[in-house]
Structures are given as structure tokens and as C-alpha cells.
Amino acid sequence: MEIFVPKTETEKQKAVAGEIRERFRRENRRPLVFARTYGCQQNEHDTEKMLGLALMCGYEKTGDPANADLIIVNTCAIREHAEKRTFSCTGAYKKLKEQNRELIILFCGCMAQETGIAEKIKRSYPYIDAVVGTDSNHRLPEIIQNVMQTRKRAYLVNSLPHSDFGVIAEDIPALRESEYKAWVSVMYGCNNRSEEHTSELQSPQ
């Protein structure tokens, strides 16, 4: 099994990011991105990388979803009541989408990988533009460009085992939340939600 995403793929995403950035320049726009993270430190690390990719596309970070042109919801499948809380939060963005039809909303992370979640979003949450599994975070520029150009919804969710593609993307920019610390991944993910197999995902309270 190939572990790493090929460098050609990450270079492709950088090129797409450049195209998006040029589009914003022509339109004289300074779009904003807002991210909401649920779950463990790995999710926080993933969000930093997705924000880094968004900035590479020409977005600037905002702390207010009402001002955002791009909203990233990075979800957790382990924490108690995660699904209920996540969908409750995501539901609040429906009004923002009605007010700004150009707003792009991405549903990312571990919950996106769960069986039935993509179908649930397709059926009940039409204002969500893309469902992005953890293996596709590095494709954020491509996903954004696809939504901008076609306004078609996308579902990038892969099933374990990962046999035909890499699961770790290197050389991805990150927007650090702290000047004094950075996350270092020592493992990636989990394919079993039972308590006995997810102790490594438990964080200090």
C-alpha cells in the first residue's frame, strides 16, 4: 500500500491554488475563511493545514462565520454526542448560505468517513457543498475550484483499506494557532470506533 500522497498531486493542488488566487485578484476580492474544529489534537492539526491551503488560495482567516466566504467544519467521530453537536452547528450555517449564495461550506474530518453520513448530508443538508474525508484534505484547492466553477456538490470519501492512493500528504502549508507550539503526528487515524480501540484518541480534559 502506498502511504504517501505523490508529490505530483501536491504540486497539482498548489497550481490550482494559484489559479484561485488569480481569480480573486481579477475580481478584486479578499475572501475570508472560517474553520470550526471538533475533537482531538489531530483534528486541530488537520484544520491548521486546511487553513494553510485556504490561505494559499487567497483567503484570509476570520473568527466570524457570518463574514466568511468559505466555512470548514472539521468533525470528530469519537467524542460523545459528536454527530448531534456537529449537525446542530452545521445547521446554523443554513441561514448564512441563504444570505450569501456564493458561500462555500465544507464538511470534513472523521465523521465524513462514517457509513451513511455522506448520504445523510446529500439528502438533508443541501447547503453543504462538499463532504471531504480525511484522506482528501490536501485536495482542498481542487474542491474549492470545482464548487466555484460548477456549483456542483462533491463527495470525497474513501473506504478502508486504502490501497490505490496515499494517505499522508507532505509539504502542506499550515496556519499555526500558536507561535510557540506545533502539532507533530505520530499516527494517523483509526478504523475502529469501539472504546477499546480508540484510547489513543482520548485527550486530557
Regions found by a protein language model. Give the residues of each.
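Proteins enriched for Cys/Gly/acidic motifs involved in redox and nucleic-acid/cofactor modification
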Residues: 1-199
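Short "domain-exit" segments at the C-terminal end of structured domains
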Residues: 200-205
